[in-house]
Amino acid sequence: MPWEEIEHTADAAFRVWADTPEDLLVEAAKALFDLITDLDAVEPEEEVEIEAEGGDLVELLHDWLEEIHFRHEIDGMLFSDFEVKELKKEEGWKVRGVARGEPYDPDRHPFHTEVKAVTYHNMKVEREDGRWVAEYVVDL
């Protein structure tokens, strides 16, 4: 599992690592939904397109996670599989991808915790020892 929950006083914080920025976005989204439910219980039956942008990789990560979280909140979806189809840097960063999952079913999906929002607090994205590393905090 290429992420770990790290200590934070009132909220939940994660440190995520990957070989590429694309994989970093995927693993950050998996960590977010692993906090909400058991990923193994969520079947990737429906596909939702996700687009996000940011002036830098921190803003992009925030917008990516917030867009996925928004689809969870508004559509009642749980996601377990994510794919970045395109990541490009022009004037800023843009990502286009998909989140796969299914509608929340309380009989099948254990509820771990409610995530209110992804925050910018202590958020970072950087290269460390040849791999990409991100840290982020979610408001519970």
From Swiss-Prot:
Binding site for Ca(2+): D11, D139, L140
Superkingdom to which the source organism belongs: Archaea
Pfam short name (any one): Archease
Listed Gene3D superfamilies: Archease domain
Record keyword Calcium present: yes
Protein task: Activates the tRNA-splicing ligase complex by facilitating the enzymatic turnover of catalytic subunit RtcB. Acts by promoting the guanylylation of RtcB, a key intermediate step in tRNA ligation. Can also alter the NTP specificity of RtcB such that ATP, dGTP or ITP is used efficiently.
NCBIfam families: PRK00407.1
UniProt-recorded name of the protein: Protein archease
